[in-house]
């Protein structure tokens, strides 16, 4: 189990949203590069970056902040938000991003995921965000009629490196991740699952470690480490004990 610290970018700053609502944002740091370096210093092994403005606009919006992050760390990075075409993927990989996350475009155009995996082997992750089990897209503003499991199954065999599963109702709410839904998704597919949304305590991490054998390989944390509810170094130490 790998603990993955998150940096969510809005207007060039590190923010956290509640349940994906852009108007419910809290700025934690106006220097994303410094924040990235701090998470690496505390032992972060991978950094998760989201271009929130990009997710809503459908195109990259925080390029200078993303460049600053990449220059500030030596650990691998993964980035999502507004990635809708091959040219954007190429641009981010050239910048030094390790893996890109396809979200809305994966639901709207599954063939794009297949094409991206063929062109950039090992570099593509699919982000599936769900509300009450149903996939939500366009920065979570639109809930579709397809379940998370149905969508994830479409990518089996494409070469997707991982599925990041976010339960929107838990995100930023500090109520614990949806263990049951995360486990069910991981058991239903043959792609590794990274949990996201709601992590609030070391007990939550223990609960995720307990379902690791189902195919849950990591967890993304944002608000919990920014607010101090979880100490990142302690959380990483806990997972390393289990390895």
Swiss-Prot record:
Active site: 8, 129
One cellular-component annotation, GO: cytoplasm
Protein's GO biological process: L-histidine biosynthetic process; L-tryptophan biosynthetic process
Protein localization: Cytoplasm
Entry keyword annotation includes Lipid metabolism: no
Pathway in which the depicted protein is active: Amino-acid biosynthesis; L-histidine biosynthesis; L-histidine from 5-phospho-alpha-D-ribose 1-diphosphate: step 4/9
EC number of the protein: 5.3.1.16
Catalytic activity: 1-(5-phospho-beta-D-ribosyl)-5-[(5-phospho-beta-D-ribosylamino)methylideneamino]imidazole-4-carboxamide = 5-[(5-phospho-1-deoxy-D-ribulos-1-ylimino)methylamino]-1-(5-phospho-beta-D-ribosyl)imidazole-4-carboxamide
Gene Ontology molecular function: 1-(5-phosphoribosyl)-5-[(5-phosphoribosylamino)methylideneamino]imidazole-4-carboxamide isomerase activity
InterPro entries reported for this sequence: Aldolase_TIM, His_biosynth, HisA_bact_arch, Isoase_HisA-like, Isoase_HisA-like_bact, RibuloseP-bd_barrel
UniProt keyword annotations, A-Z: Amino-acid biosynthesis, Cytoplasm, Histidine biosynthesis, Isomerase
Name of a matching Pfam family: His_biosynth
Family: Belongs to the HisA/HisF family.
Protein name as catalogued: 1-(5-phosphoribosyl)-5-[(5-phosphoribosylamino)methylideneamino] imidazole-4-carboxamide isomerase
Biological source species: Citrifermentans bemidjiense (strain ATCC BAA-1014 / DSM 16622 / JCM 12645 / Bem)
Gene designation per UniProt: hisA
């Amino acid at each position: 189990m790998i603990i993955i610290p998150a940096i969510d970018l809005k207007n060039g700053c590190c923010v956290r949203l509640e349940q994906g609502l852009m108007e419910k944002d809290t700025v934690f740091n106006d220097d994303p590069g410094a924040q990235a370096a701090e998470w690496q210093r505390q032992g972060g092994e991978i950094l998760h970056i989201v271009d929130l403005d990009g997710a809503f606009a459908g195109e990259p919006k925080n390029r200078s902040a993303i460049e600053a992050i990449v220059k500030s760390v030596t650990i691998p990075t993964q980035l999502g938000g507004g990635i809708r075409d091959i040219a954007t993927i190429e641009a981010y990989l050239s910048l030094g991003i390790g893996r890109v996350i396809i979200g809305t475009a994966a639901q709207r155009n599954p063939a794009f995921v297949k094409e991206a995996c063929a062109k950039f082997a090992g570099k593509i992750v699919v982000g599936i965000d769900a509300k009450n089990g149903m996939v939500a897209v366009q920065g979570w503003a639109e809930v579709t009629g397809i379940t998370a499991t149905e969508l994830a199954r479409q990518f089996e065999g494409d070469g997707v490196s991982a599925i990041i599963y976010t339960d929107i109702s838990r995100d930023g709410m500090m109520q614990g991740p949806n263990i049951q839904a995360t486990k069910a998704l991981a058991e239903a597919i043959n792609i590794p699952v990274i949990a996201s949304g709601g992590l609030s305590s070391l007990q939550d991490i223990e609960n995720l470690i307990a379902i690791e054998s189902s195919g849950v390989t990591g967890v993304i944390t944002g608000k919990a480490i920014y607010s101090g509810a979880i100490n990142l170094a302690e959380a990483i130490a806990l997972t390393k004990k289990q390895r």
